Amino acid sequence: MISARQMTSLLSSTVITLLTISIGHTAIAATEPASTERGAGGYVFASHDTEGFNTRGVAVEYLPELRNIDSLTGMRYTYRTYTQQNWQREAHQVSLLKRDIDPATANGWQLDAGMSLQGSHGMLTLDGGYHRPLAAKTGLDLFVDREWVETHAALDRGVHFIFAGVSVDQGLGDHWTVVGLAGRQDFSDGNSRDHYRAKVVFQPLLDSGLTLQLRYRTYHSDTNNVGGVYFNPANYAETLLAVGWRKRIQGWVLRMTGGMGVQQINSDASTNTHLLEVMLDSPSRGTQFVRVRGGYSRSASYGGPNYGYTYLQGEWIIRL
């Protein structure tokens, strides 16, 4: 249960969010055609891992501006539960949503900013991204994420992080693309990580939707011991071979990625990793929009090298 003080803080955030939306809506309405529609939606999330940690989330959304699922303004209230054996924790979050992304090119930006309360801890949350072309075959991505560290011990202590970085993608001819990413993750307990990732994508047949991918990621932590509060090796690296497939069916877009790789933690012997992801998006035009994501990964945690994580999430939006 949340305290009266926390509820007051949550309600204050709700009022501020509504005022921000109202002001922004009024300003935009004065400069844009009156054809902008309103909408409402919902969001669900569920995850489970092999250490018995479960996350469940349900959200409702009000959208005073709605063009499609990638172009909207609104607010969201989210209720989450975290459970592990006999332990349980509730979290409440109010967020301002803004998306302005071209579904044909993925150019644009999105922002989810708000406040989350769990246990006796409160935090301002942030999830944002920006993509723009730098040249005909060159793209730039900026991203930032501020969120709780989702383990039993970390939630009890209110540990959170902010992860920000930049990536660049470069097309090489018609069949090849290379991507590089660099980011920094700062934790509220004083720990920090430097992240580096690279990806090479080969498209053998341009109209098939099939891609072959080589992925590499590594991070380095400056604090070796965080007391088992979360998985934190000094050095981690993974190399993964993946196959991706994208198919458009009557406006619906289906994406699937599957891969296998190897990981190394510090100087330990390498072990196997697995990845499977499925994504489904409804047409960008219509009276309602659906977006579904699901996946499974097998990598490492402080419990050992065979940590498994499964998740499923979905968003449904309708015009009013």
Residue ranges and their predicted role:
Residues 1-2, 320:
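Short, intrinsically disordered, low-complexity terminal/loop segments
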Residues 2-14:
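Bacterial N-terminal signal peptides that target proteins for export
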Residues 3, 23, 27-28:
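Transmembrane helix recognition focused on a "late"/terminal membrane span
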Residues 8-9, 21, 100:
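Intrinsic low-complexity, intrinsically disordered segments enriched in polar/basic residues
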Residues 12-22:
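Bacterial N-terminal signal peptides
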Residues 28-320:
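Gram-negative and organellar
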